């Protein structure tokens, strides 16, 4: 069986994967004077510190068509995963690269998944595809399994800071400032359309945890694989892991620091939570 490659932009927070041919395609975070490429060399903590003190506009930039073509390689079938198309042009670039590659080699098959999400939910989709590949499934079978699984996966998030969202124009600076002054944490989800949908506002870690857990139940979580990414908030992530294991015995829960792109959006203290129903 020919090797099947998995390619994903860096919103998945993965750099390598055991037992599969995996390529990460970096996004970039930019200020007026500095650029942070979301690859293995990025010092995420230094980036977060710099951005917290940045007063001017900041923004993220997606991989271009050539970046995706390079990630797809010159031969073989590819499964590609991108951050939601509602936040980035990464999916459009990947689709354009797919078209070029398949025109150059009509025997190739490149399947691009607009995940309508980011971070831990994408990680779950990639883990699912890798598991299917390791079990010997065909390219078509893996694509079908991923599509079916995507219908059941979800992303929740809790933000302590919305500075970067304000700096790149996604929310008003007044709203971000008020949230910071009042100690409000915004809890939301990736909607079915792949947009950021706010679910509620909380004060304090305990109320934030309770809202996240109640939303997991509402969305049909019964355990299984659960992934928690955090930006400088390992203590809260650990507490959340512990409570999830208590409420969902047998759940396979992992927490980890977010990489560059997700740390840009989640910011200092932010949490991203991926699971399936």
Language model: regions and residue ranges:
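Mixed-charge interfacial surface used for oligomerization/domain docking
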Residues: 2-3, 11-29, 33-34, 87-90, ...
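Short glycine-aspartate micro-motif
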Residues: 5-7, 78-80, 258
């Amino acid at each position: 069986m020919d090797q099947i490659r998995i390619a994903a932009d860096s919103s998945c927070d993965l750099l390598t994967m055991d037992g599969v041919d995996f390529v990460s395609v970096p996004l970039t975070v930019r200020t007026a004077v500095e650029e942070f490429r979301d690859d293995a060399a990025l010092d995420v903590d230094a980036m977060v510190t710099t951005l917290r003190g940045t007063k001017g506009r900041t923004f993220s930039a997606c991989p271009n068509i050539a970046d995706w073509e390079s990630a797809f390689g010159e031969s073989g079938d590819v499964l590609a995963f991108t951050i939601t198309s509602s936040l980035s042009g990464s999916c459009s670039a990947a689709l354009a690269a797919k078209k070029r590659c398949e025109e150059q080699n009509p025997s190739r098959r490149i399947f691009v998944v607009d995940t309508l999400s980011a971070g831990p939910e994408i990680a779950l989709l990639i883990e699912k595809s890798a598991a299917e590949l390791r079990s010997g499934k065909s390219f078509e079978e893996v694509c079908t399994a991923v599509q079916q699984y995507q219908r059941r996966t979800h992303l929740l998030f809790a933000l302590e800071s919305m500075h970067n969202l304000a700096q790149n124009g996604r929310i008003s600076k007044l709203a971000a400032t008020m949230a910071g002054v009042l100690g409000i944490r915004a809890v939301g989800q990736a909607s079915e359309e792949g947009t950021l949908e706010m679910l509620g506002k909380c004060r304090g870690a305990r109320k934030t945890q309770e809202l996240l857990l109640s939303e997991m139940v509402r969305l049909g979580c019964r355990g299984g694989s659960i992934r928690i990414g955090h930006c400088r908030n390992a203590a809260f992530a650990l507490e959340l892991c512990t409570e999830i294991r208590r409420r969902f015995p047998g759940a396979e829960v992992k927490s980890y620091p977010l990489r560059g792109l997700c740390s840009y959006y989640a910011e200092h203290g932010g949490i991203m939570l991926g699971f399936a129903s």
